């Protein structure tokens, strides 16, 4: 069984292929005993900070004869793919001096290590705190003893389905039949297109509608109008919310195949097939969604999927009766087996076709979007009411909701949020009075820290990456110089809520295109971009999704309602050991045992294990038995995921792990995204393109 894998671009396939062919010649080797245990990480800032804290705690409490632990950062952007590439390079080089002892990564890394006999078993570590079902993925990793433990699920995440309450309220209110007593709310802005949709009267649907109404009322109560709204009728409050949502979504249209004569039930969110059908009907009912190319601030889709691969894999596993023999690939006799994929008569292949076509209907109506790696996540679009609902990893909870007033940049079809007003800063244009012809701009960061932008050469009293950036791109240089003599003032078209055609420095992972978004290197350890011709908007509370306005449900547990077993995806990086030498292996396990089992007092006076401390700080789920039964301290995403993990009737799905399964996942992801961007791609084209992408590495297994 396997947790979530890495995303690799085609540019990485060369080194991967090299490793595939060469690793058979790389045998087990000992690292130099340097007297310390190195933990390599590519985690987020919040997780890195908590790891630094627990390592400091361990080093201060350990026995003087025990080895200290040191944190090694491989990629500050959180790219587990880059972490894996670094590990592969060190294996190929037999790097005895710069390798590490532990890493957080996905479990196919164990399979990679095992091909060089460099895996480290945790059989002697006390893992009794874990719920045993969360350790069972170890017996579904290729090339290792299925009865041993090599990967510890210390940072688990699940998937949830998040409904944008105000948006969905507007959609349903617009489409509903006026005579339907279940919904008494006025349709949005007295829409003249009277709906004919019927709302079911079962208890589950009634309960959901109550939550949607509450979300719409809450959305209407902005800080500026709260007093007014508190004196208004409930129907006027929800209508105020609907009016705001209509600005983005436009008018509802009664069309065949849309919500016309449709019966809405809450159970539509329980399986992928019905959910895709519902989303398709919504897409047909709003003409703004029919536009293929959308600007960054416009409605984007009905349904956003955080991970297309996870959606397809869980739907496929559910439709195959929760049997890995009916999955796209599996592990047999400690080797990966792709026979189901290449056999068009197999249950897995036929199910794959049905599932693809279910999503294809939604794609054809411009109703589906997905995350593009290191680009705008679906959570960000939902935050600004540009989606009706989306699936998300529980780990993205901290990034999913807006504060009362949010600023963001609109750049063509991309958006960049100014998180906590600490990630986007306007570039101030230099003038002739600055007495430096190479100075082409300045930026004031938080705490009034000044950063200077130079062409050609930086002043001798400045340090690149600290208080200066050297701009090398000629397009960007020419843009900044052309603005140099202009007065920095608002144009007549600007309002207090908008800055148009401005230049900004942003700390963001959005991909540079060297046209409007330029990569300018690292600034104080963070990736910096300069964005030109951007519009900065300030979004009030009523035009954004607040945490209390979201309705968090379990991600669909079946492909269709008749599937016999409900499925819950388990994903996330594991703590993985790497062989070093006899002494360091012992010291590594000693630290891991402390990490999992020792109760420690932390700065907020809480007493918990280091593993619990890290998981709580980074919004991960730690599947300890005692924590699955107590969800009081969890956020709504994690609480929802835990509720299904704790359900004995739910089958946990974790992807089979092999050094090649990563390539399959990346191929599925890239080709599904291609189908979203190119509606001419049908199932046959999808399979042909995926087969070509996988190449001989997979075909010859």
Curated annotation (Swiss-Prot):
- Which residues are listed under lipidation as S-diacylglycerol cysteine? 23
List the protein's name: Uncharacterized lipoprotein MG185
Q: How does it sit in the membrane?
A: Lipid-anchor
- Pfam families, alphabetized: Lipoprotein_10, Lipoprotein_X
User: Does Lipoprotein appear among the keywords?
Assistant: yes
Q: Which protein family is it in? A: Belongs to the MG185/MG260 family.
- Which residues form the lipid moiety-binding region (N-palmitoyl cysteine)? 23
Q: Which NCBIfam families match?
A: lipo_P68
- Give the signal peptide as a residue range, or say none if absent: 1-22
**Cytoplasm is among the record's keywords:** no
Q: Which UniProt keywords apply?
A: Cell membrane, Lipoprotein, Membrane, Palmitate, Signal
Major localisation: membrane
> What are the subcellular locations of this protein?
Cell membrane
Gene Ontology cellular component?
Answer: plasma membrane
């Amino acid at each position: 069984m396997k947790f979530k894998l890495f995303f690799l671009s085609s540019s990485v396939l060369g080194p991967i292929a090299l490793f595939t062919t060469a690793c058979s010649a790389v045998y087990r080797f000992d690292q130099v005993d340097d007297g310390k245990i190195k933990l390599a990480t590519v985690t987020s800032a919040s997780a890195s900070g908590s790891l630094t804290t627990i390592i400091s705690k361990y080093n201060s409490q350990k026995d003087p004869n025990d080895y200290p632990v040191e944190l090694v950062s491989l990629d500050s952007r959180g790219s587990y793919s880059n972490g894996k590439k670094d590990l592969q390079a060190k294996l190929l080089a037999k790097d005895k001096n710069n390798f590490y002892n532990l890493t957080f990564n996905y479990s196919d890394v164990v399979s990679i290590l095992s091909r060089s006999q460099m895996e480290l078993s945790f059989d002697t570590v006390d893992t009794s705190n874990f719920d045993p079902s969360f350790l069972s993925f170890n017996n579904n990793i290729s090339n290792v003893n299925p009865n041993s433990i090599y990967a510890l699920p210390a940072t688990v995440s699940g998937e949830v389905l998040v409904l944008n309450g105000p948006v969905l309220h507007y959609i349903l209110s617009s489409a509903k039949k006026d005579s339907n007593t279940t919904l008494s709310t006025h349709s949005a802005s007295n829409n003249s297109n009277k709906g004919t949709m019927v709302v079911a009267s079962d208890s589950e649907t009634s309960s959901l509608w109550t939550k949607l109404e509450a979300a719409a009322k809450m959305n209407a109560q902005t800080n500026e109008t709260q007093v007014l709204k508190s004196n208004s009728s409930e129907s006027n409050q929800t209508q105020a919310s609907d009016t705001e949502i209509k600005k983005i979504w436009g008018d509802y249209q009664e069309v065949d195949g849309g919500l016309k004569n449709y019966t809405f039930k809450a159970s539509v969110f329980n399986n992928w097939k019905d959910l895709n059908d519902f989303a398709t009907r919504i897409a047909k009912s709003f003409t703004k969604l029919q536009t293929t190319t959308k600007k960054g601030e416009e409605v984007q889709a009905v349904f956003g999927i955080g991970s297309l691969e996870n959606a397809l894999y869980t739907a496929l596993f559910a439709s195959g009766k929760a049997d890995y023999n009916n999955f796209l690939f599996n592990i047999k006799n400690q080797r990966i087996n792709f026979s189901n994929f290449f056999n068009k008569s197999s249950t897995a292949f036929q199910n794959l076709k049905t599932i693809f076509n279910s999503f294809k209907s939604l794609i054809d109506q411009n109703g589906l979007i997905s995350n593009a790696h290191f680009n705008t996540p679906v959570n960000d679009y939902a935050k600004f009411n540009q989606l009706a609902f989306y699936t998300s990893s529980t780990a993205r909870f901290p990034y999913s909701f807006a504060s009362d007033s949010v600023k963001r940049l609109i750049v063509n079809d991309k958006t960049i949020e100014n998180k906590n007003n600490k990630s986007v800063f306007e570039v101030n244009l230099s003038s002739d009075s600055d007495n430096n012809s190479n100075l082409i701009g300045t930026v004031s960061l938080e705490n009034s820290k000044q950063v200077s932008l130079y062409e050609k050469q930086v002043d001798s009293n400045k340090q690149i990456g600290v208080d200066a950036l050297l701009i090398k791109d000629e397009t960007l240089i020419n843009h900044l110089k052309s603005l140099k003599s202009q007065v920095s003032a608002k144009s007549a078209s600007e309002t207090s809520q908008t800055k148009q055609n401005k230049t900004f420095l942003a700390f963001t992972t959005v991909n540079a295109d060297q046209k409007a978004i330029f990569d300018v290197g690292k600034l104080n350890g963070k990736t910096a971009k300069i964005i030109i011709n951007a519009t900065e908007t300030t979004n009030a509370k009523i035009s954004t999704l607040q945490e209390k306005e979201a309705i968090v449900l379990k991600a669909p547990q079946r492909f269709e309602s008749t599937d016999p077993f409900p499925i819950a995806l388990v994903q996330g990086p594991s703590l993985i050991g790497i062989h070093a030498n006899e002494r360091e292996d012992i010291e590594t396990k000693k630290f891991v045992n402390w990490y999992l089992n020792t109760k420690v007092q932390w700065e907020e006076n809480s007493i918990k294990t280091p593993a619990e401390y890290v998981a709580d700080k980074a919004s991960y789920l730690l599947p300890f038995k005692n924590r699955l039964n107590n969800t009081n301290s969890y956020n709504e995403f994690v609480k929802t995921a835990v509720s299904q993990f704790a359900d004995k009737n739910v089958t946990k799905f974790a992807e089979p792990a092999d050094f090649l399964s990563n390539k399959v996942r990346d191929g599925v992801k890239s080709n599904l995204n291609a189908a979203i961007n190119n509606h001419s791609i049908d199932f046959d084209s999808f399979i042909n393109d995926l087969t070509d992408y996988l190449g001989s590495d997979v075909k010859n297994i």
